[in-house]
């Protein structure tokens, strides 16, 4: 997982990692200590205080979604290897990897050893992030060549280039994190902002309005709310 630094931090021990506010750090292990994470920045790694950072969700992590929903979403993808990681339905606290291959969706249980390392087969990793990166170039299956690739996102388009699916009644969500637009057509917002959803037809990117602006935003940055406006 990645995290954004909320404050400057200067290391006071050899095994700590210094960083500046706004830096994007790669979190390697969230279970080393209750108050410290192990992270990497600019090729260096060390421990960082967890209250100095804000976790940035990956587009491939979908949390508590049912197996059937994962199959429905991945079934719409065009390319083999499109994947997501979800929390296991049968084993709370564990994770499952769902991957599109051909006309089917395959599911792999993410295993953990006594030291807390993650693995599918033999090679073990400190984090889900490392496992995903490894299997982008090494097959997740022993029977077929399946390499992980991100789910396709909605291209940034304008005007009538793409028909939108409008909810029958206004739907509102609230931002869990700050989001700064990276491309034209994206909608920026701050944590806590309310956004009216005008198109939720894609599993990854929704279209909405906030403070008079309209654009696309990542759906895993928001949470549904019950709000009459």
Curated annotation (Swiss-Prot):
GO cellular component, one term: cytoplasm
Disulfide bonds: none
SH3 domain: residues covered: 1-58, 168-227
Any one biological process term the GO annotation gives: insulin receptor signaling pathway
Any one Pfam family match given in the protein's UniProt record, by short name: SH3_1
Subcellular location: Nucleus; Cytoplasm; Endosome; Golgi apparatus
Superkingdom of origin organism: Eukaryota
Gene3D superfamilies: SH2 domain, SH3 Domains
Effect noted on mutating residue 49 to L: Unable to reinitiate oocyte meiosis
Protein keywords: Cytoplasm, Developmental protein, Endosome, Golgi apparatus, Meiosis, Nucleus, Repeat, SH2 domain, SH3 domain
Main subcellular location: nucleus
GO molecular function, one term: phosphotyrosine residue binding
All copies of domain SH2, residue ranges: 60-152
Function: Adapter protein that provides a critical link between cell surface growth factor receptors and the Ras signaling pathway. Promotes meiotic reinitiation during oocyte maturation.
Domain remark text: The two SH3 domains and the SH2 domain are necessary for the reinitiation of oocyte meiosis.
Protein name, UniProt field: Growth factor receptor-bound protein 2-B
Native species: Xenopus laevis (African clawed frog)
């Amino acid at each position: 997982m990645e995290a954004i630094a909320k404050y400057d931090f200067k290391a006071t021990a050899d095994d700590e990692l210094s960083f500046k506010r706004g830096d994007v750090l790669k979190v390697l292990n969230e279970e080393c200590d209750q108050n410290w994470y192990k992270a990497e920045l600019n090729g260096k790694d060390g421990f960082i205080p967890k209250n100095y950072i804000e976790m940035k969700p990956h587009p491939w992590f979908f949390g508590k979604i049912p197996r059937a929903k994962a199959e429905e979403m991945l079934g719409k993808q065009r390319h083999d290897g499109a994947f997501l990681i979800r929390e296991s339905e049968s084993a709370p606290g564990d994770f499952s990897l769902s991957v599109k291959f051909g006309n089917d969706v395959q599911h792999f249980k993410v295993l953990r050893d006594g030291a807390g390392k993650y693995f599918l087969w033999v090679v073990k990793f400190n984090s889900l992030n490392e496992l995903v990166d490894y299997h982008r170039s090494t097959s997740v299956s022993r029977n077929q060549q399946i390499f992980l690739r991100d789910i396709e996102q909605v291209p940034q388009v304008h005007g009538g280039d793409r028909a939108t699916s409008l909810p029958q009644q206004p739907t509102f969500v609230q931002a869990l994190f700050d989001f700064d637009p990276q491309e034209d057509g994206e909608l920026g917002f701050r944590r806590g902002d309310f956004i009216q959803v005008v198109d939720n037809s894609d599993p990854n990117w929704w279209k909405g309005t906030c403070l008079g602006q309209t654009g696309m935003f990542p759906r895993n940055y928001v949470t549904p709310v019950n709000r009459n406006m």
